[in-house]
């Protein structure tokens, strides 16, 4: 980055960098615009009980990111995922609702007017108070925003009604740890697991699931899942220690429609464009964030990315802002970088 600016910030024409005091992993964009700009939440990744969530304010006109110190708060263990409530969630207060996963699913109200963060609920479905199976991820249903699904190392997916703070249903989803979950429709979600499968579930028929993909090598874990919100026929997944992004069409199970193989090391994160059905971004250990445009048919030599961005070190996290679709956020080491696309 060519010039530095105040507030732990450096910027160029197309990127803004925020330097955190600690390594970062979880990250989320708010769909609400506040008086100070667009809010971004980032979570620390410290091998310790005491971790933090910081709320940042991003002004795209002035290309500045500022921490909001009054809205920084402690979090038990590193949050495995952060999400702000979808815009479809109607709430009486003007504050933002933020969800985090780790030991439990937690809901927080971020109120910038009063500079407060209020813990709203801690949701735990464990029958024994001494034990909790860590949550690896969760997804907020934007069609039915009272519904939030979590996944855990104990092979289950749990669907919560967050308005009533009760479990709607809990399913044994896989044979091994469940690593990620994504909603497609109001009652349909999918998950990926260390057992190497992508499975789709319908809450109207809980006894059955559809396996739409399995790792080519048995038991190669699948780490992440992204469902294309602009075209629900397509989803993407990544395999452990693999440089591939696998694109699936749920109408033709088992065979990927495309495999994106231009990363030089393992892929860690994927995100579909919020405003286009054809674009997806991936980030990996090769320090690169690649944006792909998916053609109808891949050529004989595969698909090349339409744009390449190099970060300072391995990219651990990536989010594409739905409220500002010109911006992608990536996290690497102790930095959160916003890229204009």
Curated annotation (Swiss-Prot):
One cellular component (GO) term of this entry: cytoplasm
Record key words, sorted: Acetylation, Cytoplasm, Developmental protein, Repeat, WD repeat
UniProt xrefs under Gene3D superfamilies: YVTN repeat-like/Quinoprotein amine dehydrogenase (2.130.10.10)
Q: Which residues carry this modification: N-acetylmethionine?
A: 1
- Recorded GO terms, molecular function? DNA binding
Indicate whether Zinc appears among the record's keywords: no
Pfam families for the chain = WD40
Q: What does this protein do?
A: May regulate MYC transcription factors. Involved in epidermal cell fate specification such as trichome and root hair development, seed mucilage production, and anthocyanin biosynthesis by acting at the dihydroflavonol-4-reductase (DFR) step. Together with GL1 and GL3, promotes trichome formation. Activates the transcription of GL2.
Tell me, how does this one assemble? Interacts directly with GL3 and BHLH2. Part of a complex made of GL1, GL3 or BHLH2, and TTG1. Interacts with CCT8.
Query: What protein name applies here?
Result: Protein TRANSPARENT TESTA GLABRA 1
Recite the lineage of the species: Eukaryota, Viridiplantae, Streptophyta, Embryophyta, Tracheophyta
């Amino acid at each position: 980055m060519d010039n530095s600016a105040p507030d732990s910030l450096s910027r160029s024409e197309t990127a803004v960098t925020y330097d955190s005091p600690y390594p970062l992993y979880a990250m989320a964009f708010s769909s609400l615009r506040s008086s100070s700009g667009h809010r971004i939440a980032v979570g620390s990744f410290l091998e310790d009980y005491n971790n933090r969530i910081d709320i940042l304010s991003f002004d795209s006109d002035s290309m500045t990111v500022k921490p909001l110190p009054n809205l920084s708060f402690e979090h038990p263990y590193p949050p495995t995922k952060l999400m702000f409530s979808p815009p479809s969630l109607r709430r009486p207060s003007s504050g933002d609702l933020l969800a985090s996963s780790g030991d439990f699913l937690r809901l927080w109200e971020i109120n910038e007017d009063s500079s407060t963060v209020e813990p709203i609920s801690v949701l735990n479905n464990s029958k024994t108070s001494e034990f909790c199976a860590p949550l690896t991820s969760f997804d907020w249903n934007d069609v039915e925003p009272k519904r939030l699904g979590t996944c855990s190392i104990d092979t289950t997916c749990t669907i919560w009604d967050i308005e009533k703070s009760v479990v709607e249903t809990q399913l044994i989803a896989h044979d091994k740890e469940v690593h990620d979950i994504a909603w497609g429709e109001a009652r349909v979600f999918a998950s990926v697991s260390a057992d190497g499968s992508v499975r789709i579930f319908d809450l109207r028929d809980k006894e059955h699931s559809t396996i739409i993909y399995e790792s080519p090598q048995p038991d190669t874990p699948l780490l992440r899942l992204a469902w294309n919100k602009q075209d629900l026929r397509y989803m993407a997944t990544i395999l452990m220690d693999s440089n591939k992004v696998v694109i699936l069409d749920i109408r033709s199970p088992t065979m990927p429609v495309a495999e994106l193989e231009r990363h030089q090391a393992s892929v860690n994160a994927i995100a579909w464009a919020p405003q286009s059905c054809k674009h997806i971004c991936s980030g990996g250990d090769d320090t690169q964030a690649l944006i792909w445009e998916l053609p109808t048919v891949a050529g004989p030599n595969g698909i090349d990315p339409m744009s390449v961005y190099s970060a300072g070190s391995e990219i651990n996290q990536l989010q594409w802002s739905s409220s500002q679709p010109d911006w992608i956020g990536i996290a690497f080491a102790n930095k959160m970088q916003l890229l204009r696309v």
